[in-house]
């Protein structure tokens, strides 16, 4: 089987797996299928191996550690090393614009700056000292966030839109999610840095992909490779087609083509996620609220069995006040007074 077919099959499998993970997180029937599949595999895989895998997954995803930060920096370093070592030099020989070639480095610098801010900024940790102040920031909707609820772990009253992070073991104001790639919670005070981090990471991956593609296209055009012919295994003469051309480029520039495939897939994945977080920002939702929206009781859902004495409770977004106000809330978050004094 041709290399290109195998490579495309691999990419399709990865993308399909990610799509299924996203869909399963919101679809209860698919969750049941996933649990059933896990039970089947548990009967096949030895128990000692199951414990080892479970322990590893628990460490990676349910404890604070720097594994994914290191992986993030290693992957980013490998991409930019290859870009600098080969693509940048070849593009200079082709006399491409220097500003065009330096753009990925500019995006890298901005990305690392906001990556550091996202990792190190307090996301909005709720303590006994600021508990009362946070209780007055957002209105309780009495559906997803009822009043007078205490956190069973922190023993603090839970402000609206807050959540206890089981990984970090603290409650976070306007909790969005825990991101393993930055080893920190994403909350009210660092969501702005996280948005710019994702934006610049997407832009840097896309820019590296565009520059690398430009180099390969220039090479094909200048060498007239698309006009060449080749002889197949049966001795038949063929004009150079796209599949054969890509395989030829892979054999000639394997590291560049492999890096290009990686950053192209990464650009699509990050681009899709960026659109999602921008949608949440524009509608003043958090990832936690978006996910829990399916669990909130809704009179529009005919499959929900209501208790006889219960009034239908409709979850609606009471925090969205227009695009401008929503974005202002993210990029200019409210700080409790005593927290401002500490920072000053």
Swiss-Prot record:
A motif (Di-lysine motif) lies at residues 341-344. The chain crosses the membrane at residues 3-23, 68-88, 100-120, 193-213, 256-276. Residues 1-2, 89-99, 214-255 are lumenal. Pfam families: DHHC (PF01529). GO terms for biological process: positive regulation of innate immune response; protein localization to plasma membrane; protein targeting to membrane. Residues 24-67, 121-192, 277-344 are cytoplasmic. It is an enzyme of class 2 (transferase). The keyword Zinc does not apply. Keywords: Acyltransferase, Cell membrane, Endoplasmic reticulum, Golgi apparatus, Lipoprotein, Membrane, Palmitate, Transferase, Transmembrane, Transmembrane helix. GO terms for cellular component: endoplasmic reticulum; endoplasmic reticulum membrane; Golgi apparatus; Golgi membrane; plasma membrane. Residues 149-199 form the DHHC domain. It comes from the Eukaryota. Palmitoyltransferase that catalyzes the addition of palmitate onto protein substrates including the D(2) dopamine receptor DRD2, GSK3B or MAVS. Mediates GSK3B palmitoylation to prevent its AKT1-mediated phosphorylation leading to activation of the STAT3 signaling pathway. Also catalyzes MAVS palmitoylation which promotes its stabilization and activation by inhibiting 'Lys-48'- but facilitating 'Lys-63'-linked ubiquitination. Belongs to the DHHC palmitoyltransferase family. This is Palmitoyltransferase ZDHHC4. It comes from Homo sapiens. The gene is ZDHHC4.
């Amino acid at each position: 089987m041709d290399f290109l077919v195998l490579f495309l099959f691999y990419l399709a499998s990865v993308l399909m797996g990610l799509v299924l993970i996203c869909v399963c997180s919101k679809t209860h029937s698919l969750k049941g299928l996933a649990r059933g599949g896990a039970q089947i595999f548990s009967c096949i895989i030895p128990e000692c191996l199951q414990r080892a895998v479970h322990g590893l997954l628990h460490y990676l995803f349910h404890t604070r550690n720097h594994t994914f930060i290191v992986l993030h920096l290693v992957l980013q370093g490998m991409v930019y090393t290859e870009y600098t070592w080969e693509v940048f030099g070849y593009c200079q020989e082709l006399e491409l614009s220097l500003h065009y070639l330096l753009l990925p480095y500019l995006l890298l610098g901005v990305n690392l700056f906001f990556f550091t801010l996202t990792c190190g900024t307090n996301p909005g940790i709720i303590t006994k000292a600021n508990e009362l102040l946070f209780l007055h920031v957002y209105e309780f909707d009495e559906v997803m966030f009822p009043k007078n609820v205490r956190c069973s772990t922190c023993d603090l009253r839970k402000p609206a839109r807050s959540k206890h992070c089981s990984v970090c073991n603290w409650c976070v104001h306007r909790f969005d999610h825990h991101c393993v790639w930055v080893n920190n919670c994403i909350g009210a005070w660092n969501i702005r840095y996280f948005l710019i981090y994702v934006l610049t990471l997407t832009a840097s991956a896309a820019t590296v992909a565009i520059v690398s593609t430009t180099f390969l296209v220039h090479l094909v055009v200048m060498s007239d490779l698309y006009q060449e012919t080749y002889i197949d295994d049966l001795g038949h003469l063929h004009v150079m087609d796209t599949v054969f051309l890509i395989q030829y480029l892979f054999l000639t520039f394997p590291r560049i083509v492999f890096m290009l495939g990686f950053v192209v897939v990464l650009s699509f994945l990050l681009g899709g996620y960026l659109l999602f977080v921008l949608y949440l920002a524009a509608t003043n939702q958090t990832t936690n609220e978006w996910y829990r929206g399916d669990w909130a009781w809704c009179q529009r859902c005919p499959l929900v069995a209501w208790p006889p004495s219960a009034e239908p409770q409709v979850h609606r977004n009471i925090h969205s006040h227009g695009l401008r106000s929503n974005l202002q809330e993210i990029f200019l978050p409210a700080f409790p007074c005593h927290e401002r004094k500490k920072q000053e």
